[in-house]
């Protein structure tokens, strides 16, 4: 997942220092959200691995439901902030107008991917906790190479596509995040039989596990 952002940084380097600085600084803000969701997912994986070993299917689903709700709320919050205040975000890191302008364009497009990325990160940790490390691996590899391909097309205007520069890098990342989300989340919710989590399980009563989840996850988020 981090490789997607890294690919953006590398591929916009040929556009000049302003473009490279804009993408690198914008990704610093996105990384705050990314590491938060990774921490939530890791906290969830501590609990899901235990419940998986205990064969406690209900508690396993409750933990995933809690993680889903928190990631959705956090994702919506970051989406709104990134979409509505990209210029303020960029000014936190730099005062150069040319860099800020390109960073705003990048963040505007990338804001749409926040919710998708958060859920993908969290569910990937859940998969690993129940012994399925291959699915997140395939998802990350696919998203990485899809992002490189889309970046090449949209940054440099190949195969008849418009030359979008920094905005093209953000568009490539958005497409990669959509792929990652469909690969990880849609499979878990609609096709997976190992965990058996479905959309209606998101609304399960989970008060009995909420305190434990917070106690485990918050320290992980802070340390990340």
Predicted regions and their residues:
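Helix-terminus/linker motif at the lipid-water interface of multi-pass membrane proteins
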Residues: 3-21, 90-97, 153-164, 221
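Short alpha-helical transmembrane segments in multi-pass integral membrane proteins
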Residues: 48-115, 161-218
């Amino acid at each position: 997942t981090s490789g997607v952002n890294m690919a953006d940084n590398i591929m916009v380097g040929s556009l000049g220092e302003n473009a490279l600085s804009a993408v690198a600084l914008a990704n610093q803000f996105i990384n705050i959200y990314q590491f938060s969701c990774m921490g939530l997912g890791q906290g969830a994986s501590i609990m899901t691995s235990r419940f998986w070993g205990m064969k406690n299917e209900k508690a396993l689903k409750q933990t995933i439901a809690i993680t889903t709700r928190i990631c959705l709320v956090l994702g919506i919050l970051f989406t709104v902030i990134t979409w509505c205040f990209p210029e303020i975000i960029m000014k936190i890191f730099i005062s150069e107008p040319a860099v800020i302008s390109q960073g705003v364009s990048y963040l505007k497009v990338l804001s749409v991917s926040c919710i998708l990325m958060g859920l993908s990160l969290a569910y990937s940790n859940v998969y690993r906790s129940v012994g399925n490390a291959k699915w997140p691996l395939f998802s990350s590899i696919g998203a990485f190479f899809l992002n490189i391909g889309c970046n090449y097309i949209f940054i440099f205007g190949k195969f008849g596509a418009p030359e979008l520069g920094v905005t093209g890098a953000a568009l490539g990342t958005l497409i990669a995040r959509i792929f990652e989300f469909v690969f990880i989340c849609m499979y878990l919710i609609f096709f997976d039989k190992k965990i058996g989590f479905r959309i209606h399980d998101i609304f399960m009563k989970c008060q009995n596990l909420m305190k434990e989840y917070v106690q485990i996850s918050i320290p992980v988020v802070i340390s990340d």
